[in-house]
Regions:
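A structured binding-face within diverse protein domains that lines the active/interaction site
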Residues: 1-126
Length: 126
């Protein structure tokens, strides 16, 4: 989800690829020890410049990996930037759809399928 301020009201939007029901985001994971010896698992999702579909809502977007790039991205033997950097591109225009959803997405107490329901018709009727 990403939020956009419209008429002094913040509106959340759901984003999803248009061409595939399941997708993967480029991310990094590390297991390490801090100075006290405590073991820590950390992760991050990589973002890049937004494509023209996402730019009206936000200036950045997660890097969506193509299915044919999954093996390369997940292979720990692949460590040369020349092999990995070409995978870190914004999705081409037309490959990401977005629509407004309920503000209920803001609360972790809410966890149900209606959170991803498109509410554009409700907004238009208000």
């Amino acid at each position: 989800y990403e939020w956009k301020k419209e008429n002094n009201v913040k509106q959340p939007y759901c984003f999803r690829p248009t061409s595939q029901p399941i997708f993967a985001l480029a991310g990094l994971y590390e297991h390490w020890q801090d100075q006290s010896g405590r073991e820590i698992d950390s992760c991050t999702i990589l973002v890049g410049e937004a494509n023209q579909d996402v730019a009206p809502i936000h200036d950045r977007m997660p890097i969506i990996l193509k299915p044919e790039d999954f093996d390369c991205w997940l292979d720990p033997q692949v460590q040369k930037k020349e092999q990995l950097l070409p995978l870190l591109k914004a999705a081409p225009p037309g490959e990401v759809d977005h629509y407004p959803v309920s503000r209920a997405v803001n609360s972790p107490a809410n966890d149900h399928a209606d959170l991803i329901k498109n509410i554009q018709a409700q907004i238009n009727s208000d």
